[in-house]
Every structure is written in C-alpha cells, then in structure tokens.
C-alpha cells in the first residue's frame, strides 16, 4: 500500500456570503449569525472582519463572537447592513443582512445549546465556570441579554455563567435561559468525571 500526501492547493476560492434576514421589535439588540449560511468551497474557517456598515446611522453596529450586533432604533422600517466575511487565507466577500424592525414582530423563544466541559476550562481547584450564553441563540434578540437560571445544588449561576465542581462521576446541569419576552429555552452543561480529564501540563 502506497500512501501519498497531496500538496496544499496553490489557489484559494473566496468565500461566498449569502443574504440574511432578521425580524425584531424596535429598540432591541440583535445578534445575527450571518456566517451560518455563508460558504467556502475550500472548507476554510470563516470569520467576520471589520465593522458592519449601514447607510442609515440609526443603527449601532458591531461584531461579537462572529455575530453582527445591531442596536435597533425605535423607528420601524427595513435596514440594510453590509458585512465582510473572510477565510483563513485572505479571501473575502461582502454579505447583506436585512433587518426588519416592526412592532408586529412575533416573539421567538431562545434556544439553549449544550456545553461540554473540557480540561482547559477546569481551574486548579477543580471548579469550572462555563459561559453558557456564548453558544446559545436568540433569533429576535441577543443571547447575551438572556437570563440564566439553574435549579441544581451542584451548580451556581454567576454573572450569567454556570459554575460547577468536578466530581467522581459525570453529571449534567440543566439550565434555563429566559428572554425579555419571558420565553424560555433549556440546555445542559456536561460536567465530566475527574477520571475523564486528561492531565494538564503547565508550561
């Protein structure tokens, strides 16, 4: 059996941004996951670069955790936002995010996404603090505006993060996120047993 290693391609296909639409009520802060439907033929990881732009200065725009953050005005209407996506090799494309601001926007429940604790997250005292909101979703708002609650004696909620202690057995911490409309979603933090964690070598 002969095994060969293919050389890395010398050409790079630029990413392709796909249009996005977000609908939300006036005055909200939304976090649009615009990269979720963008494509890269080479399979390169995509990220946002620069600050998104809008011809209407009624929106305040920024980027957080590869999401387009927009503080919406009280004025209803359609707002067009442009953002730049880049791959890991310098290819770029400009995408369009349309934000429909309307008081008639139906409330959407947030979505909690499970978190799995890794050895790098565990502190020297055997505790772990998991920023659970970082991978949660709120289609008509921002996940970082959600309220976190957990009814588990083995865990504490601190600054909207879940703090737990590594034990002899794996366990799950069920938590709930609640948005400004009172709608909820749930997910779990998977806390591994001490024996499941690989030893960490400090440099």
Region locations from a protein language model:
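Charged, amphipathic alpha-helical scaffolding segments
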Residues: 72-78, 84, 166
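Strand-loop-strand motifs at the edges of beta-sheets in extracellular beta-sandwich domains
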Residues: 57-72, 152-172
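Aromatic-enriched hydrophobic runs in primary sequence
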Residues: 54, 59-61, 91-95, 154-157, ...
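Extracellular interdomain linkers/hinges and stalk-like, low-complexity segments
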Residues: 1-43, 80-84, 88-142, 146, ...
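Short secondary-structure boundary micro-motifs
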Residues: 5-7, 53-55, 67-68
């Amino acid at each position: 059996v002969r095994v060969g290693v293919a050389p890395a391609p010398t050409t790079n296909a630029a990413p392709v941004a796909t249009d996005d639409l977000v609908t939300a009520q006036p005055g909200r802060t939304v976090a649009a996951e615009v990269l979720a439907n963008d494509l890269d033929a080479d399979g390169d990881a995509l990220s946002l670069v620069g600050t998104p732009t809008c011809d209407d200065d009624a929106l305040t725009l920024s980027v957080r955790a590869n999401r387009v953050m927009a503080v919406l005005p009280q004025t209803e209407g359609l707002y067009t936002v442009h953002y730049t996506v880049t791959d890991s090799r310098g290819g770029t494309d400009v995408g369009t995010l349309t934000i429909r601001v309307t008081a008639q926007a139906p409330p959407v429940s947030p979505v909690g996404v499970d978190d799995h604790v890794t050895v790098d997250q565990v502190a020297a005292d055997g505790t772990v603090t998991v920023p659970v909101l970082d991978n949660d979703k709120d289609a008509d708002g921002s996940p970082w505006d959600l309220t976190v609650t957990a009814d588990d004696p083995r865990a504490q909620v601190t600054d909207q993060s879940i703090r737990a202690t590594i034990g002899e057995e794996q366990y799950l911490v069920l938590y709930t996120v609640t948005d400004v409309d009172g709608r909820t979603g749930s997910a779990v933090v998977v806390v591994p047993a001490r024996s499941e964690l690989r030893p960490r070598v400090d440099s």
